[in-house]
Amino acid sequence: MINTEGTKSLEAVDIEELLSILPHRYPFLLIDRIVEIDGEQQAIGIKNITINEPHFMGHFPAKPVMPGVLILEAMAQTAGAISLLRLGNKQTNLVYLMTVDNAKFRKPVIPGDQLKIHVRLLKKRSGMRRFSCVAEVEGVRVAEAEIAAMIIEAE
């Protein structure tokens, strides 16, 4: 299927395919699936937050809150996954996070929440990508940022 921008729309991506695309593994694979993809232009990733995640042992034991930096990493993994999917060469490239700008954390993310991560490509130049990212829980914005990443060939 081709959309109006001429980029290929892809099927949703489950955890098995994410494992074949991204190098991240437990406890640092921070997306469970991608439910909507429009080529490399935009996507929606899902992260189900559970009390069993190791960061909750210390952040914070009496009132667990997902660290903001891990929300940013989930955004980066969603953006990286769609960039690598578009290239079509799984595990032959890596995506490195280069910058995070205008990060804002608006509400805490706690166990039981489902984080919905919206990423939208803002700029593409050679191996560089810039994305606008928004994380929501039940339709309420909990975090946002702009990120830049570089795609490099894996050695």
Curated annotation (Swiss-Prot):
A biological-process GO annotation? fatty acid biosynthetic process
One GO cellular component term noted in the UniProt record for this chain = cytoplasm
Q: What is its main location?
A: cytoplasm
Assigned EC number = 4.2.1.59
Top-level EC class as recorded in UniProt: lyase
List the catalytic activities from the record. Answer: a (3R)-hydroxyacyl-[ACP] = a (2E)-enoyl-[ACP] + H2O
Specify the superkingdom.
Bacteria
Question: Which positions, given as ranges, span the membrane?
Answer: none
Q: Which InterPro entries match?
A: FabA_FabZ, FabZ, HotDog_dom_sf
Protein family according to the UniProt entry: Belongs to the thioester dehydratase family. FabZ subfamily.
Output this protein's name: 3-hydroxyacyl-[acyl-carrier-protein] dehydratase FabZ
Identify the species of origin. Bartonella quintana (strain Toulouse) (Rochalimaea quintana)
The organism's taxonomic lineage, starting at the top: Bacteria, Pseudomonadati, Pseudomonadota, Alphaproteobacteria, Hyphomicrobiales
Q: Supply the gene name.
A: fabZ
